[in-house]
């Protein structure tokens, strides 16, 4: 080989080695340039690396109340500014990576109404699923409808906000497992077992707050949980009574979520989760998503609540259950009682700053903002696939206390000659 060629090769090799060394050093230097005490930049780094997924937002119900689910007439400026807590610019400012939209419909106004009182709740729930999905479709440049955790991760990689649906109360499906199944097929991926009323499956926390006994889960409850486990639908224990929490955790085969609840030991409100349940949630591999409602997080002095109150709840749950079992579920647009510093969805980066300032590592913060709930959702799906592969069929059990002729009256269709008419002319 000619001397000049050897010289050029040597120079090229030396340059390559130098560049290789430089590339191995620069990222380390770039990371090191963010001081540990620069919590804003560290929070930004967390939110770039993990999707911030909120467990509960009531914007679809706010749309129903304000526009009767009309979103195409120009009266819902979601892309610019809405009066409530949530719109697209504020979601972007809040660095949100995913949102469980609640397709909420209220319990009957009479707290003493029979559980099987005929209502329009199931119809209205389908309308809320419809408007939520139409909203996501309308703003598909920024939002992506997802019904599985893989899609949620893909949305984050594409710079979109994953949008998922949750039903807030078993009354919304008429205490019917078949109706629940259809809601799942329509895209709902969690159901809160009760809202502020008992149903055929469990006792609500609001019932106990009203001075009535905590009867926990009903005899029909295990059938519901069995079907939700089979489907791969997240079991949400926010709003249920403390005994209902304990009973359901005994029968579920999959991790549970609390979509918007905080720590009972910090604030003695029955909507919060007691320590013994937090420990069981850890064994169950579930997640408690901390809510921001002032009267929940400081029952004694709600006016004093600020972002540090929420940090206190987060750290208590992390201490009792572990950092693998805590998340965020603000309840934006479902309450007017929000902490100072967390007035709308744009404030999430500030919360993460405060969590880091209080001593959490960035790894712990990533778990908090979204990795935990995605892990739970993934495990719920894996368990469902295993159950389905075992040959488990859809649950057909019907609540014995239900009204309605077709299922509550026995006919001779199977046992003897069919009648000439079934009364369905």
UniProtKB/Swiss-Prot annotation:
Keyword Transferase: no
Binding site for Zn(2+) 2: 168, 239, 260
Gene Ontology terms describing biological process: proteolysis
SS bond list: 107-197
Glycosylation-annotated residues: 403
Entry GO MF terms: metal ion binding; metallodipeptidase activity
InterPro entries per UniProt: Metal_Hydrolase (IPR032466), Pept_M19 (IPR008257)
CDD domains, sorted: rDP_like
Amino-acid positions noted as binding substrate in the UniProt annotation, renumbered to this chain: 195, 271, 331
Record-linked Pfam families: Peptidase_M19
Segment forming the signal sequence: 1-31
Catalytic activity: an L-aminoacyl-L-amino acid + H2O = 2 an L-alpha-amino acid
Keyword Zinc: yes
PANTHER family, alphabetized: DIPEPTIDASE, MICROSOMAL DIPEPTIDASE
Enzyme Commission number(s) from the entry: 3.4.13.19
Positions annotated to bind Zn(2+) 1: 56, 58, 168
Main enzyme class: hydrolase
This protein's name: Putative dipeptidase MGYG_00085
SUPFAM superfamilies from the UniProt entry: Metallo-dependent hydrolases
Function: Hydrolyzes a wide range of dipeptides.
Keywords: Dipeptidase, Disulfide bond, Glycoprotein, Hydrolase, Metal-binding, Metalloprotease, Protease, Signal, Zinc
Cofactor annotation: Zn(2+)
Family membership: Belongs to the metallo-dependent hydrolases superfamily. Peptidase M19 family.
Native source organism of the sequence: Arthroderma gypseum (strain ATCC MYA-4604 / CBS 118893)
């Amino acid at each position: 080989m000619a001397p000049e060629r050897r010289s050029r090769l040597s120079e090229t090799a030396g340059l390559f080695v130098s560049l290789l060394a430089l590339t191995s050093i620069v990222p380390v230097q770039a990371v090191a340039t963010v001081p540990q005490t620069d919590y804003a930049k560290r929070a930004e780094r967390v939110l770039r690396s993990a999707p911030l997924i909120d467990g509960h937002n009531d914007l679809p119900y706010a749309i129903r109340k304000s526009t009767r689910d009309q979103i195409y007439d120009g009266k819902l400026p979601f892309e610019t500014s809405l009066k409530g807590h949530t719109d697209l610019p504020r979601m972007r400012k809040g660095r949100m990576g995913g949102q469980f939209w609640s397709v909420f419909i209220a319990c009957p106004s009479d707290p003493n109404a029979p559980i099987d009182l005929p209502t329009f709740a199931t119809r209205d729930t389908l309308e809320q699923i419809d408007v939520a999905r139409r909203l996501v479709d309308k703003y598909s440049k920024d939002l992506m409808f997802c019904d599985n955790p893989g899609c949620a991760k893909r949305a984050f990689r594409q710079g979109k906000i994953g949008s998922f649906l949750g039903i807030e109360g078993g009354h919304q499906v008429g205490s019917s497992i078949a109706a629940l199944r259809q809601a799942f097929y329509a895209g709902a991926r969690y159901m809160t077992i009760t809202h502020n009323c008992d149903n055929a499956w469990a006792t609500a926390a609001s019932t106990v707050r009203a001075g009535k006994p905590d009867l926990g889960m009903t005899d029909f409850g295990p059938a519901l949980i069995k079907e939700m486990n089979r489907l791969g639908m997240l079991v949400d224990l926010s709003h249920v009574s403390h005994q209902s929490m304990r009973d359901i955790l005994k029968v579920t085969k999959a991790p549970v979520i609390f979509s918007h609840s905080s720590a009972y030991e910090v604030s003695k409100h029955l909507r919060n989760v007691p320590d013994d349940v937090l420990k069981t949630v850890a064994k169950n591999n579930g997640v408690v998503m901390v809510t921001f409602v002032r009267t929940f997080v400081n029952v004694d002095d709600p006016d004093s609540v600020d972002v540090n109150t929420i940090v206190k709840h987060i750290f208590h749950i992390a201490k009792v259950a572990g950092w693998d079992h805590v998340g965020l579920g603000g309840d934006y647009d479902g309450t007017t009682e929000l902490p100072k510093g967390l007035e709308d969805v744009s404030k999430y980066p500030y919360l993460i700053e405060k969590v880091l300032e209080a001593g959490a590592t960035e790894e712990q913060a990533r778990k908090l903002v979204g990795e935990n709930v995605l892990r739970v959702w993934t495990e719920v799906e894996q368990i469902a696939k295993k159950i389905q592969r075992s040959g488990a069929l859809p649950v057909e059990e019907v609540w014995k206390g239900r009204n309605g002729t077709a299922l509550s009256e026995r006919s001779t269709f199977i046992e003897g000659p069919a009648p000439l008419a079934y009364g369905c002319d």
